[in-house]
Structures are given as C-alpha cells and as structure tokens.
C-alpha cells in the first residue's frame, strides 16, 4: 500500500506477506527507439511494459514504479504529457502505480523505469518463477506467437520490407513491436499452478532459453515445427519467419518449463494459447534446434546485444 507518494523526498509504501522483487530498464533515443517512429504514447506504454514483463515473468504482481527522465531542452511538453498517459495505460493494464521519480537535463533523451513487485503467496509460502529451476525432463513452453515484434522492427528500419505487404498486416507487426502486451496475469497463473522455472522473452527465444539453461545447468532441444508464429509473420517474411520467431526479440511472451503433470495444470489455468516447443535435457548447457526428423538445424538469428552496434531497436 502506498503510504506517501510524489511530493516528498522519498516515496513510502508498506509491503504485505511474501517477497518483494525489483527490476529496472532504460530506453535511450537512438539506441532503443526513435520518437518519430514509436510515438509518445507508445513510448510510455513500452517503457512501463518492459518492466512489468520482468515482474510478471517472476510470477509477481507490479506494485510501485519510479520514473527517471533525461530530457533535451527541445522536447515538447505535450509529448511528455502523452508519454505519461501511455505509462498510465500500461499500469492500468498490468497493475501498479507511479510512486515518484526524477527529471534531469540530458543531451540524449532517455527514460528509466524502476519497478517493484510482490510475490504470489501459496499458503504461507512465497512462490517465485526463476531461471535456475529448470530440470531435465521438463517440457518447454511459450505463451503466444513469437517473432511479430522482430518483424515490426524490420519494417520500422526499412529492412527487406515486402512490397506487397497489406496495410493491416503492417499495422499488426508494428503494434507487436511498439505496443507489446506483457504477460503479467499469465505469470501469476503459472506460479499458482506450481510452475517454478520461467523468464520473459525479450532477447529472442534461443538467446533467452540459453540464459535459462545456463542458470539451471541444463540443456534444451527445441523442435522448429512447434515454434509458434502467426499467419501474418509467415506471410510477410516467408523465408525468415522462423529466424524471427527464434531470435527476433522483444516478444515479451513467457518462456517456462515444467514436468508434464504440472504443464497440464498450467495449460488449463491459462486463458491464452500455450505452445510446447521442446524439452529440457541434462547438461551440457545450450540449446539445439531440430527438424521433424530430429536432425539439428542452424538458424541465423538476431537477438539483442546491448554492446553490438549492429543491434538496434526502435
């Protein structure tokens, strides 16, 4: 419960039973977005949603956010007001409140959000979803289709834009990239179903599954034909849809693992589609993608690298 909000030297809130989680994410103009492409309201939505996705991926509900802005002198006040409206939209969708923040003058426009969340309590025990809890024999699953955000980024950057792409298909891919829907309620449902291992997909399925495997000291096999990609992505990028689904990044869907009996419970608890895409295996760590004959295949992907000058969001 928020006891003291914006206006004092610090925000004050009380925490209930369970565990408190915290995350932060920064979006920098020119590296993570271009304001003329994303728009002010979508910028606010996405700045919040990248954080609520992290909290939801741990099976927690968002509580309080702190927002820090680095502003150039030429930025319009009307744009900033619209950005905050987008933030409020995102918090209304996922839960949580803005408790405070800071504003600084900066030569580069940036938005930093720090977000706290509260764990699910089952009985008297807090239950978190974690990257280090995957076990050999677990099934690997994801929420929703993958790759549309990566397709939207390609369109925004003008890379290989299909000449015959329908207007509604372009809008669908752009929305996936600029206005992602974090799976907060789904993460909480997974925690209540008994799932222990999960993370969100922000850097691409292969890259993020590799991180989960490293933390859990296990390996994984993914079947390419089971990776979910919707008809729009397949139509727009018939030669690259699998690469985008495996490595496009910024999907903000959930990746999770569980034994078969828990997976059945989790699937029944979810409102949206769940796709089982593979299985966890004993170490060595790493991810192998196979075709329908179980032969390994190589897929070129473009997962996000914070220090790679060729990686760019928008």
Give a label for each model feature.
Residues 15-17, 27, 63-157, 279:
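Glycine-rich anion-binding loops of enzyme active sites
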Residues 73-99, 104-111, 116, 192-314:
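Glycine-/charge-enriched secondary-structure boundary and capping motifs
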Residues 159, 164-181:
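A short, charged helix-loop
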Residues 135-144, 178-205:
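Internal active-site segments that recognize and position negatively charged phosphoryl groups
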Residues 1-57:
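N-terminal glycine-rich phosphate/pyrophosphate-binding loops that anchor nucleotide-derived ligands
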Residues 28-38, 121-124, 167-173:
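Glycine/charged-rich beta-loop-alpha catalytic/anionic-binding loops adjacent to active sites
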Residues 38-42, 173-180, 196-197, 242-244:
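Short pre-catalytic strand/loop immediately N-terminal to key active-site residues, enriched for Gly-Thr
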